[in-house]
Amino acid sequence: MTSGELANLAHLRRARDLMDRDYARPLDVPAMARAALMSPAHFSRQFRAAYGETPYGYLMTRRIERAKALLRRGDRSVTEVCLEVGCTSLGSFSARFTEVVGESPSAYRARDHRAGATVPACVAKAWTRPERTSRNGEATG
């Protein structure tokens, strides 16, 4: 790997860290590209090449991951969780949650999650990481 490629990855990591840290803030591709010191189009291409998904897809996966944790607690409504993780449309949030998780936010919230309550947080995070599913319910790569 060349020094230019390493510098490029460092810039992309800066944008990815921004998404991980500030997922609840309104973030768009131009803002993420600024964090990576790239044009929006170049940033989108480079991010997808490096991480295998679009910047927006990565951001939404982080939001869904956090939403799952909040829904497991059961003390917030789906609407409250939607807004807390940075989504502004309940319909879009529910559709994306269902696409990624394979069930609606309401169904996920209603499920019994006590079995995972004693699992260490580091294991639970990996265990509950959203995995995009196809329309027929199979996990996609």
Locations of the language-model features?
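Alpha-helical bundle regulatory/interaction domains
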Residues: 1-42, 49-50, 54, 66-141
